[in-house]
């Protein structure tokens, strides 16, 4: 899931924080 968070943070910083 870490990879998804890292990728999401590039697309949308809020998602990375968030963590989704």
Curated annotation (Swiss-Prot):
UniProt keyword Ubl conjugation, yes or no: no
Record keywords: Pyrimidine biosynthesis
Signal peptide: none
GO biological process annotation, one example: pyrimidine nucleotide biosynthetic process
Domain of life: Bacteria
Transcription regulation is among the record's keywords: no
Family: Belongs to the metallo-dependent hydrolases superfamily. DHOase family. PyrC' subfamily.
Self-association and partners: Heterododecamer of 6 active PyrB subunits and 6 non-catalytic PyrC' subunits.
Job description of the protein: Non-functional DHOase.
Protein name: Dihydroorotase-like protein
